[in-house]
Amino acid sequence: MSKIKQSLRKSLFNRYFALCSAVTLATVAIMGALVIGFSASYFSETTRASLRKNAEQAVEITLVGMEDYGYQKVPVSTVQNGYRIISSTTETQIFLVNLEGKTLLCSEGENCNHRTYSISEDIIKKAAAGEYDGSGTLGGIYDTSHYTVGIPIKHGEEVLAVLFASTE
């Protein structure tokens, strides 16, 4: 009789052990997924806030440069050097686009892939309204997904151009 009781105890122990192990494993998996989800969200928000700050600094450089020309011309060398400084310290690509979506200046110089493509009209409209904030290939400009922020360059209420800042 003793062997039967011992066998039942082992069997009961194994069942409870398996149940507790499964619950613990499921809890750890759920908690891990939550941590990864919150971390990804935090990283995304931090990246976008950093991009917006970089873009705002680039807009200031652009407006200061354009001021000497009555906001009719962009002094390429001055503004592009400012973009390069911001870009190199923050690992951000900065480019200035006219309202038709064509790239005028880029932190990467003359031979950048931004000059090959035009930004779509709806992205330009959102950025001109100060609302563009997205991730993706930006209409095929990038091969991989990039975070991108678009900010209008305004003189008074007039939108002169749009500035984009992107990073992987």
Language model features by range: what are they?
Residues K154-G156, L163-E168:
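Helix-start (N-cap) segments at beta->loop->alpha junctions
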Residues L99, I141-D143, H155-E158:
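Short strand-connecting beta-turns/loops that link adjacent beta-strands
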Residues S2-T103, E108-R115:
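Juxtamembrane segments flanking the first transmembrane helix
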